[in-house]
């Protein structure tokens, strides 16, 4: 069957690369894709924006697309799944109503409260003075979140009162995140270790993916501003078997059943961003309605199952008939970013030293890249590449990933040097 992957990031390169390994796949299109997907012999880019729903739908109908997999959040939140389903096309992702779990942080916090799903204490605000009064009452550290989509950057962890007040003013009065910040969530600062817990949902059944841990801050040792993610590894040792069971029982199942009970039946990837306390209690920091980026890259490197088969089962309500199979070895991905990211950065720099052939137990996934007129790969985003590797331990996977990354150069390239440090400190 022909398959369409929507999106242009590292996540979509990884999903397309994995989908192409399926015996069910004939032709795989990526809309709009990037230089990495353009250079994959098994993938073909289509010049349609991820948010051009009419264009995507017309393409799917004219190219006999049997399955569409949605990568990013933006098309989900504007209803790509609703449009494809209305046309009778199989698409794996949540409806516009169900995608509110990511599209509105206030909706999510209220939903969690209604269903007694563990999360941080919070309040929603549209009024600056009321928000400032709450911040002064609670004190720092405290977390300020823009309500809407802000490309993973709309969260300020304020360690001082002054930072908190600045964040409130920037969002509510200063328009720092446009419409996304016209309502904010102010919530308690949670201590613990973060994990990304991603599952597939078909409306009723749940199939967990491998666990992972992202590294949100731009600098080594988790310093500097938040980003879309500077690297990830899988599995996350903080998610022990006991914690895994708690997450399923206290977070995932109540969410899937709660959404169904409220008339928003959830299908697609569901990503719970969790904080896990020292005693193993998970609390929800956020939900995403899609696979994480960069978590997808190390997770796909470990996946042995047929991704297409699983996504099809997800569209047919048959995930209860499926299991997922994983390489026992851990994997780790390091993001190579453009100088200046997550603030202003240059684009259009030629990337040198990319591997010319497939490497054993490793893969360079492209994110913010494109081909220029000379067919050279150039930078086209803040997060440019995710260099991913398998190893017998997280430490070995880390060593191999950095070794692969070493030869790749462009003007201003940088990366964190400590991806995976928490797992390595645990002796994994």
Curated annotation (Swiss-Prot):
Which Gene3D superfamilies does the record match to this protein?
3.40.50.20, ATP-grasp fold, A domain, ATP-grasp fold, B domain, Phosphoribosylglycinamide synthetase, C-terminal domain
Q: What is this protein called?
A: Phosphoribosylamine--glycine ligase
Keywords in UniProt for this one? Answer: ATP-binding, Ligase, Magnesium, Manganese, Metal-binding, Nucleotide-binding, Purine biosynthesis
Known pathway? Purine metabolism; IMP biosynthesis via de novo pathway; N(1)-(5-phospho-D-ribosyl)glycinamide from 5-phospho-alpha-D-ribose 1-diphosphate: step 2/2
Q: Which residues bind ATP?
A: 135-196
Q: Which residues cross the membrane?
A: none
The protein's matches in PANTHER family, at most eight in alphabetical order, are given as: PHOSPHORIBOSYLAMINE--GLYCINE LIGASE, PHOSPHORIBOSYLAMINE--GLYCINE LIGASE, CHLOROPLASTIC
**SUPFAM superfamilies associated with the record:** Glutathione synthetase ATP-binding domain-like, PreATP-grasp domain, Rudiment single hybrid motif
Q: Which reaction does it catalyse?
A: 5-phospho-beta-D-ribosylamine + glycine + ATP = N(1)-(5-phospho-beta-D-ribosyl)glycinamide + ADP + phosphate + H(+)
Species whose genome carries this gene: Yersinia pestis
Q: What is the lineage of its organism?
A: Bacteria, Pseudomonadati, Pseudomonadota, Gammaproteobacteria, Enterobacterales
Entry binding sites for Mg(2+):
286, 288
What Enzyme Commission number(s) apply to this enzyme? 6.3.4.13
Q: What family classification does the UniProt entry report for this protein? A: Belongs to the GARS family.
* Domain spans labelled ATP-grasp: 109-316
Matching InterPro entries: ATP-grasp, ATP_grasp_subdomain_1, PreATP-grasp_dom_sf, PRibGlycinamid_synth_ATP-grasp, PRibGlycinamide_synth, PRibGlycinamide_synth_C-dom, PRibGlycinamide_synth_C_sf, PRibGlycinamide_synth_CS
């Amino acid at each position: 069957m022909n398959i369409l992957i929507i999106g242009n990031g590292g996540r979509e390169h990884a999903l397309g690369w994995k989908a192409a390994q399926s015996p069910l796949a004939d032709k795989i299109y990526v809309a709009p894709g990037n230089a990495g997907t353009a250079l994959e012999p098994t993938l073909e880019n289509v010049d349609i924006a991820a948010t051009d729903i009419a264009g995507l739908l017309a393409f799917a109908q004219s190219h006999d697309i049997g399955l569409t997999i949605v990568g990013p959040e933006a098309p989900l939140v504007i209803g790509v799944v609703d449009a494809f389903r209305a046309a009778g096309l199989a698409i794996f992702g949540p409806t516009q109503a169900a995608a509110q779990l990511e599209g509105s942080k206030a909706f999510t916090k209220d939903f969690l409260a209604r269903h007694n799903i563990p999360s941080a204490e919070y309040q929603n605000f549209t009024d600056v003075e009321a928000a400032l009064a709450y911040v002064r009452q609670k004190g720092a550290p405290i977390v300020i979140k823009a309500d809407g989509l802000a490309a993973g950057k709309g969260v300020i962890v304020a360690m001082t009162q002054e930072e908190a007040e600045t964040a409130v003013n920037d969002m509510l009065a200063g328009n720092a995140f446009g419409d996304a910040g016209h309502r904010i969530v102010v919530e308690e600062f949670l201590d613990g270790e973060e994990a990304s817990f991603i599952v597939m949902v078909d409306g009723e059944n749940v199939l967990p993916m491998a666990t992972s841990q992202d590294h949100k801050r731009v600098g080594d040792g988790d310093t500097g501003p938040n980003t879309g993610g500077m690297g990830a590894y899988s599995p996350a040792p903080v998610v022990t078997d006991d914690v895994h069971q708690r997450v399923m029982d206290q977070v995932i199942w109540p969410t899937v059943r709660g959404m169904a009970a409220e008339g928003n039946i959830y299908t697609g990837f569901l990503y719970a961003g969790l904080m896990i306390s020292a005693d193993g209690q998970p609390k929800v920091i956020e939900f995403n309605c899609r696979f994480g980026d960069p978590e997808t890259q190390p997770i796909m490197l470990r996946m042995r199952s047929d991704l297409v088969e699983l996504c099809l089962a997800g569209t047919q309500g048959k995930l209860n008939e499926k299991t997922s199979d994983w390489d026992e070895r851990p994997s780790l991905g390091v993001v190579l970013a453009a100088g200046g990211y997550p603030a202003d950065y240059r684009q259009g720099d030629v990337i040198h030293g990319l591997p010319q052939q497939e490497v054993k137990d490793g893969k360079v996934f492209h994110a913010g890249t494109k081909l220029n007129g000379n067919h050279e790969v150039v930078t086209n985003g803040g997060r440019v590449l995710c260099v991913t590797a398998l190893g017998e331990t997280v430490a070995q996977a880390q060593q191999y990933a950095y070794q692969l990354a070493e030869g790749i150069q462009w003007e201003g390239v940088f990366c964190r040097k400590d991806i995976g440090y928490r797992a390595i400190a645990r002796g994994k």
